[in-house]
């Protein structure tokens, strides 16, 4: 066991950057692999989620470039395959790598030797005793309340007089 990366703490969540070019630029400066730790080793990389796959692919490439013999990728959530309307700025399924790709296809796209996700059953089992509500909409497509008909960026681009949001206020 060892620390395989140095992380630039001043770079935030890369998947919420406005454009693909911004996401890739942020990923390049976010992490640096430590060759002396990973060279010649079988590495298990654990992450909270794969959203678009940009960070995942870059991170795995960094490990390989630093000499990792194998990279096995484990995700502590189910595949993020549906838009999140309640906190993550991902309004469209086309932006999500898990939409339209199998786990094996995602593994190939990100360049891992193996890929495993936590199942939705295990996630809900972990959260069952929580006093807070738990939304699985981005994993299952089943939301606790009706999903909005228009994305928030579209709502906020309109004058308030034209937005349906005004009716709810």
What are these regions (language model features)?
Residues 1-169:
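PRPP-associated nucleotide enzymes
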């Amino acid at each position: 066991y060892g620390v395989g990366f140095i992380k630039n703490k001043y770079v935030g969540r890369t998947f919420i950057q406005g454009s693909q070019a911004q996401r890739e630029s942020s990923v390049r400066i976010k992490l640096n692999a430590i060759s002396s730790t990973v060279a010649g080793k079988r590495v298990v990389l654990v992450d909270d989620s794969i959203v678009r796959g940009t960070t995942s692919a870059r991170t795995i490439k960094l490990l390989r470039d630093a000499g990792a013999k194998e990279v096995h990728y484990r995700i502590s959530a189910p595949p993020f395959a549906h838009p999140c309307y309640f906190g993550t700025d991902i309004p469209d399924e086309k932006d999500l790598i898990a939409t339209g790709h199998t786990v094996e296809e995602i593994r190939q796209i990100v360049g891992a030797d193996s890929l495993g996700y936590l199942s939705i059953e295990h996630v809900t089992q972990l959260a069952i005793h929580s006093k807070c509500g738990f939304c699985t909409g981005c994993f299952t497509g089943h939301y606790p309340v009706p999903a909005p008909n228009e994305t928030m960026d579209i709502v906020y681009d309109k004058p308030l007089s034209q937005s349906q949001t005004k009716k709810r206020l």
